[in-house]
Amino acid sequence: MKFNQFSYIPVSPETAYQELRSLGFEVSLDASAKANFESFVRKYFLFFEDTDLALKNWIADPETDLLSFFQSDRPLTAEVFGLVALQLLGFVPNVDFTDSVAFLEKMAFPIAFDGSLNNLHQLLATRTQSGNTLIDQLVAQDLIPISNDYVFFNGKSLATFDTNQLHREVVYVETPVDTDKDGLLDLVKVTILRPNVDFPVPAMMTASPYQQGTNEPSSDKLTHKMEGDLLVKPAGKISLSRPEIKAPEADLTPINPVTKAEERFAHTDTYTLNDYMLARGVASIYVSGVGTFNSEGFMTSGDYQQVLAYKAVIDWLNGRARAFTSRSRQHTITADWASGKVTTTGLSYLGTMSNALATTGVDGLEMVIAEAGISSWYDYYRENGLLVSPGGYPGEDLDTLTEFTYSRALLAGEYLRHQKDYEAYLNELSTAIDRKHGDYNQFWHDRNYVQFADRVKATVVFTHGSQDWNVKPINVYQMFRALPKSLEKHLFFHNGAHVYMNAWQSIDFRESMNALICQKLLGLDNGYTLPTVIWQNNQSEQTWEVLDNFGHDNGKHIQLGKSEASIANHYEEEIFAKYGKAYQSFKDDLFMDKANAITLDFELDQDIQINGRVHLELRVKSSTNRGLISAQVLEMGDKKYLAPIPELKRMSLDNGRLFKEEALRELPFKQAKYRVITKGHLNLQNRKDLLSIENVTPNEWMTIGLDLQPTIYKPNKGDKLRLVLYTTDFEHTIRDNSDYEVTVDLSQSKMTLPY
């Protein structure tokens, strides 16, 4: 374990004293450091009446138990403080460590001992080996009582709300859209978990089309075949118009208003970051949206109709939209329990809707936590004029996702009434996505949130993984960079895949979110400042660093060679079938120079931190009138790399007081032969830009530019980078087995590493 403490807020000695005393620690400004430390440690043993016995079972140094130390005349030193602090944090001498000084240094222990009360204050805010901060662990053990009111420590809310006596209610919010065109504005089901209190509370809202269930069997039947020819597209320029996202004014006329919801529930799937804040006084709201189980409308998959339907929930929390107690629309109900302040949460599609909602500029949305979210749906299913499936899901497209999330059809009565119209709508959508050409068009433009980034007013927190080939890093990169310069924004860029990071051992992500939420939603003047970019260093385990930005303008140019080299697109049928059946076998062969590719190795002559988009400038020609180029950059070398999927550790993370406990996680540092740094794909007909389609003349040289997926990665001098240039990618692109070649003039081609 390493300490990476970004949530702690430095305080004055007076504040440290006051907060310690308010929690029941009997420290004194007049007492010695040793006396205060003894009082602090004895308080830790909440379940012991005879704390002498507990102290005898801990040690102050290898020769002295802690009780004997406190009874002696010896002063408190940094060495004793450090050894006892380790035991307070759950580390066991002679098991987890033998040399406490070396162990503390190795773990980057964040507290510089000076004997002050600030040391004890910061120790409470430090994570234990179990993943909980020491103060959260003690509160879970009833250090302070459940009060159903806010208690803050170090600018963060503590788990003082009763999660056994929550309001669990359902309402149906009226949206400004009629997506199924039945003449009625669509209602969306809203599932609410909130503290049982008599004062207004803010809310964490998760907009998830998956929340009420999915239709996987029907979606699987629509999965597209990836084998086929790369078509020649007619040359031309694509024209677009700016989408209109203004909603009509809501009808706020009450209808037989009531103050109590008539529908409740026993269980719903939850997100543990929401659970964590629910125990700390923030309501938790889940909305599936239009076209889902027990909501109305059709699944419009990423357009602003879907977004405005989610926005209506925030409007309802602020008195700007109506909600009904049931879909019969007989009684309206207001959110009289809500303060109106909201943050959105969730990963993938959920993070996508966070991005989209932010671009509406809706009042009340104070903060957005967008984890691995899409910012432009074209960049999820397409790339540079090509069909490019999300990593791990070849053959998926927006129509299959629409079918997957259209859970309204899981209700047999709804299926009976609406399926015919829905299937007609789905056929229109399947045509509009244009799998035939793979081009950007108005359909995709209507699902591009980046163009409205200037409307974002909320504080934005992004998380994204460098190894996320599902929602690829271009999505966070372009949104992060498009936001107004005056806006507060933050990015946690880790080395994982498409994964949550709130339960990781190495970083206090959820505590950082607690501090921000208290500041933005509860109005707490805690002075908290989160760095703009927090990056997980790829060179060692559990190491995080602060960076100034994502994307740098400096570039290191690497000439690719001195000759020409060719890529054969065609494979023997047996090999082609093998790769199509198991794309991982293709990747294994590709990276080991056993597939059809140009493989180039470069030894770095300097340390460098790649930050941004690796750019390829290639002089190429195709033997036919079409073609695609794919590229991947890897670090080669048999050594330890961070694996992309977190390993589960012990079930020790408590989100309240024995509430929604979950497993601690961390990316393992494992031996491997290589690490993918970045990748990219380009249709040669889109070599100028995304909106320009040009002819490819057989055997005529072209100069193309290809920006690969943005990343942050640090190799050292002497490390070997491998650039692989190829055509068909069996995981991502169309699988065209035509017999043609792409030739690259390496002497006129280069790779630029941004830093």
Curated annotation (Swiss-Prot):
This is Xaa-Pro dipeptidyl-peptidase. It catalyses: Hydrolyzes Xaa-Pro-|- bonds to release unblocked, N-terminal dipeptides from substrates including Ala-Pro-|-p-nitroanilide and (sequentially) Tyr-Pro-|-Phe-Pro-|-Gly-Pro-|-Ile. One of its GO terms (biological process) is proteolysis. Belongs to the peptidase S15 family. Its EC number is 3.4.14.11. Keywords: Aminopeptidase, Cytoplasm, Hydrolase, Protease, Serine protease. Its main location: cytoplasm. Removes N-terminal dipeptides sequentially from polypeptides having unsubstituted N-termini provided that the penultimate residue is proline. The active site is at S348 (charge relay system), D468 (charge relay system), H498 (charge relay system). One of its GO terms (cellular component) is cytoplasm. The keyword Transferase does not apply. One of its GO terms (molecular function) is aminopeptidase activity. Homodimer. It is found in: Cytoplasm. The keyword Cytoplasm applies.
